[in-house]
Every structure is written in structure tokens, then in C-alpha cells.
């Protein structure tokens, strides 16, 4: 069932992410809320505060200094746990803490193994840095609204294969993705669910044990529509039979 509003979706997302993180200590997870016009930062800060109450420390990482500074401003209680992708990578590859004002000032001893890294809004341009961050981290990682797919043109077959292998490691802890005439949802540990948009709202259409591609979604929606038409025609036939008696 689709959540009726953002706060319900958030609650579902947080619960699903906690469920996912409680499993594999080296898990690679994604969380996607793809609403048009969504202000992602407040959601991410609420998520970070929620996870910060757990046993494992968190690091909240952003693509650039501007986004990190905005997060520190809006979430001052998390400021010491906020940095950019590149700042964190430099710190994790060095025994010395980075200078104050450039990112994290509370390095985690032991190689950050127990930390949960939360990477927000990683794009294709960030792919190399994100891959390096993840390779240097032995603990759990969460990508929030990532956009790492594509961008492999011109890097050669070896590079493309390496990228496919890296992207294949990730599993959705939570996803709520509006599509044209439908919506896709996944809440760990349950299956992916596809919903069809009807005049009176969304209706469940199909479930999948993997993230369905466009062809699979279209096939499920067409099959669902055909089933609906068939039921309607049978109802009309029964009505006509009743009138003729």
C-alpha cells in the first residue's frame, strides 16, 4: 500500500532502513524518495538524527562544500559528523585528521569500520569518488537519492564492467518512485510493488522479487489493464443475460 503523505513515507523509509542496517554489517543500501520538488535536506537530517540514536555512529556526506555547509547550518547538532565526499576520502586515507573547517574533526579510530556512511545525492560526476569512499570503508553505506547510473560512455569495456559490478552491489532499503501513470515502492525486507494510477487513485498491480525494468513494468500494467477489461466485460455479459431473462 502506498503511503498517503511524505511523513508516512519517511516513517516507512526509516523503519525499512533500520531493518536493512540490522543485517549485513557491510551492507550497501539505497533509499529513494523521488517526489518532484521534494526538499531532500530536511528529510536527510531527520534520518540522520533518527539513526544517531542507535549504537553505530554515522557520517553524513555531501557532494560539495556548499551542500555540506548548508547541512551544518540546518543540523548544527550533527555538524561534526558532516563532510564532503572528498573530505571524508582524504581523511580515511590518512592517519592524520583533516584541518578544522574542511570537514570532519572527530576521526573514528579503527578505520571507521563501525560507522554508517550516508551519502546524499551522489551524481554520475561523483562516481569515482563514491567508489573510492566505499572501497575504503568496511562498514555499512547508504546512498540517498543516488544518480550514479549511466555516464560510462568512453571509459572502455573494463571500466564499464567495473562500474556495473559496483552498482550491482547495492540493494534498495526503501524506494518510493512516482512514474508515468504508476508508482514503484520497495520497503525492506518486502518485495518491490508496482501500483497503477487509476482515476480514483493508485491500485496495486504486481510485485517483483527484484527492481523491475521498464519493460517488466509495462508488461505488468498491460496485463493488469487487460484483466480489468476482461472483468468489466464479464460483468456486462452477466448484466445483459439478466435483462434477457
Model segments located where?
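A conserved mid-domain beta-alpha-beta active-site/ligand-binding segment of alpha/beta enzyme cores
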Residues: 152-227
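Long terminal accessory regions outside catalytic cores
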Residues: 221-245
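Positively charged, amphipathic N-terminal segments that serve as targeting/anchoring signals
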Residues: 1-125, 136, 239
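A short, gly/pro- and small-residue-rich
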Residues: 124-150, 156
Amino acid at each position: 500500500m502506498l503511503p498517503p503523505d511524505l511523513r508516512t513515507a519517511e516513517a516507512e523509509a526509516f523503519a525499512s532502513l533500520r531493518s536493512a542496517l540490522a543485517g549485513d554489517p557491510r551492507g550497501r543500501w539505497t533509499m529513494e524518495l523521488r517526489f518532484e520538488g521534494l526538499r531532500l535536506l530536511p528529510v536527510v537530517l531527520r534520518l540522520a538524527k533518527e539513526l544517531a540514536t542507535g549504537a553505530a555512529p554515522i557520517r553524513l556526506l555531501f557532494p560539495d562544500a556548499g551542500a555540506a555547509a548548508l547541512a551544518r547550518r540546518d543540523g548544527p547538532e550533527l555538524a561534526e559528523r558532516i563532510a564532503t565526499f572528498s573530505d571524508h576520502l582524504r581523511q580515511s586515507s590518512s592517519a592524520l585528521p583533516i584541518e578544522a573547517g574542511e570537514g570532519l574533526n572527530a576521526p573514528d579510530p579503527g578505520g571507521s569500520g563501525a560507522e554508517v556512511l550516508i551519502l546524499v545525492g551522489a551524481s554520475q560526476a561523483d562516481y569515482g569518488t563514491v567508489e573510492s569512499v566505499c572501497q575504503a570503508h568496511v562498514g555499512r553505506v547508504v546512498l540517498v537519492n543516488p544518480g550514479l547510473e549511466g555516464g560510462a560512455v568512453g571509459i572502455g569495456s573494463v571500466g564499464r564492467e567495473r562500474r556495473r559490478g559496483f552498482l550491482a552491489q547495492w540493494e534498495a532499503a526503501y524506494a518510493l518512485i512516482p512514474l508515468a501513470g504508476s508508482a514503484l515502492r520497495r520497503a525492506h525486507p518486502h518485495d518491490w510493488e508496482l501500483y497503477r494510477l487509476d482515476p480514483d487513485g493508485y491500485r496495486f498491480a504486481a510485485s517483483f522479487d527484484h527492481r523491475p525494468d521498464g519493460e517488466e513494468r509495462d508488461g505488468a500494467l498491460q496485463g493488469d489493464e487487460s484483466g480489468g477489461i476482461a472483468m468489466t466485460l464479464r460483468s456486462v455479459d452477466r448484466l445483459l443475460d439478466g435483462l434477457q431473462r
